[in-house]
Each structure stands twice: as structure tokens, then as C-alpha cells.
């Protein structure tokens, strides 16, 4: 059985690795796209919006609802990518906890 000191060292090591993975994730950028790529939203791994780009074809002053819907779709797409990558990157730590 592991003694308490070894468990603490292992936990500290895992914490440092997890913090490094979180920093790497935050530095990554994810691009979400709406249908037909008419709206693209770029977010960082820590879910901050970097940019939202609109194809001129989607900008219709008479139909702002479609533009709004496509913007939401693009942002949600990027958020899904972030969540999937987060699970892959940080989920591995769950099985390594010493307790």
C-alpha cells in the first residue's frame, strides 16, 4: 500500500500535468461553422470568443433572424469541439488519481 507521502507526491505531479494540459487547451483555437460555412466563430479552449466572421451572402438587413441563428449555430459548434477536446485531454487524469 502506498504511503501518504507517495500519494501526495503523485497527486502534486498529476496537478502540475493537469494545469499544463489546461494551459495548452486554453491556448488552442476552435472554429465552429454554421450551415454552408456562412458564419464562422473562433473561440479559445477556455471558451473566449476570438472572432465571428460572416460571409457577405448571409448579411441581409431584412432577415437578421437567420444571421442570429447561424451565429448561435457556429458558436455552439465551436463549444462542442472544445468540450470534446477537453474530455480527451483532461479525462485521462481521472483514472490516475492515487486515491
From Swiss-Prot:
Keywords: Cytoplasm, DNA-binding. Pfam families: YbaB_DNA_bd (PF02575). One of its GO terms (molecular function) is DNA binding. Its main location: cytoplasm. The keyword Cell membrane does not apply. SUPFAM superfamilies: YbaB-like. Coiled coil: none annotated. The keyword Cytoplasm applies. Transmembrane segments: none annotated. Homodimer. Binds to DNA and alters its conformation. May be involved in regulation of gene expression, nucleoid organization and DNA protection. This is Nucleoid-associated protein SP_1102. It comes from Streptococcus pneumoniae serotype 4 (strain ATCC BAA-334 / TIGR4).
